[in-house]
Amino acid sequence: MNILIVEDDDYKYKNMVRDLKAVVEDLNIFRLNNCMDALMYFRSLKNNSDNDYDLLITDNYMPLRKDSFDLVQSAIYIINSFKNDVSESVPICVCSSDKFNVKCDYDYSVLYEPTKSLQEDFSKIIDDINRKENDLKDEKILKIYIK
């Protein structure tokens, strides 16, 4: 499974990776750590058929730029840019330390707490993604036989 994580906090990122490794066997992770780098990366993937991400996980608040300490509600920009430039069909999870009410199109949300494991949350998300993927495969097979 190929997962793209947009997260500025190293400690939180390490915890996320640890918990993802516990629930995903064949895991490849690519990380971006600020809003502008993510937006530029997404733009570079536009019209690129090599995009093979299975899940995007993004923080809700993070610095706009690498050397900035001012946090912005970046999830809105990240999600909209990803959907416009990369893929409308890849599931998106907002993983935030703060309760959030992001008014945009995401599939999953996880409230991050440093003392709580995310394994159960990630396991449910991965199971749901796999179930939906299997359902799509079944639909394609049925369409072949119906023709």
Named regions from a protein language model:
Residues 57, 93-94:
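Hydrophobic beta-strand core positions in alpha/beta domains
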